[in-house]
From Swiss-Prot:
Residues the entry annotates as binding Zn(2+): C7, C10, C44, C45
Name used for this protein in its record: DNA-directed RNA polymerase subunit Rpo10
Natural source organism: Nanoarchaeum equitans (strain Kin4-M)
One CC-aspect GO term: DNA-directed RNA polymerase complex
Cofactor note: Binds 1 zinc ion.
Length: 65
């Protein structure tokens, strides 16, 4: 799955927040603090970013038939 472009529930654009969110969380920062800093207040948007799993690099390793 690619990073989410919009919230699945309310439709708010989230694509521009994905890279910063992912970088900061991977560095060990608390996801709650990162989401608060990014200005995400709605729980649906927070859920969308928290639950996103990017598997594209894994899929790209397989050859096309």
């Amino acid at each position: 799955m690619l990073p989410p472009i919009r919230c699945f529930s309310c439709g708010k654009p989230l694509g521009h927040l994905w890279e910063e969110f992912n970088e900061r969380v991977n560095k060990g920062e608390d996801p709650k603090k990162v989401l608060d800093d990014l200005g995400l207040e709605r729980y649906c948007c927070r859920r969308t970013l928290l639950s996103a799993v990017v598997v594209f690099p894994v899929i790209a390793k397989f050859k096309k038939v």
